[in-house]
From Swiss-Prot:
GO terms for cellular component: plasma membrane
UniProt record similarity statement: Belongs to the peptidase A24 family.
Annotated signal peptide: none
InterPro entries per the UniProt record, alphabetical: Peptidase_A24A_bac, Prepilin_IV_endopep_pep, Prepilin_peptidase/N-MTase
GO molecular function: aspartic-type endopeptidase activity
Protein name per Swiss-Prot or TrEMBL: Leader peptidase HopD
Source organism: Escherichia coli
Pfam families cross-referenced by the UniProt entry: Peptidase_A24
GO BP terms: signal peptide processing
Amino acid sequence: MDATLPFLILYACLSVLLFLWDAKHGLLPDRFTCPLLWSGLLFSQVCNPDCLADALWGAIIGYGTFAVIYWGYRILRHKEGLGYGDVKFLAALGAWHTWTFLPRLVFLAASFACGAVVVGLLMRGKESLKNPLPFGPFLAAAGFVVGWDSLLAGR
């Protein structure tokens, strides 16, 4: 039996769980992001060992990129602009999709978020800008779009 399918089911379940949890609570708990990260690295080791280094670099670059944004904004504005769960979620997505897909993933997530802001403005006006916008659902959606290329097409 091919080991890919159980890994992809785990990826889908954890990503949907993170999508729903962040949309409802505004949090991305470690108990969901950490298993997603480790399962992504294990997936590469078991199913595609040639890409393990790329998956590891994906986790490092994903974490590092969003950590710089998180801390830079926090230092400059004295408040959070991006949750640290988003930092860990991008690290996990980097482990699954490798570093080569991270630019596309972040661009898609940001595009989805901008679209949601525009829809919110059109439907509720400026009131919609007063509430923080969870970024996790957009990362999860972008992960599924990018996953079509990176995971199902064999990287």
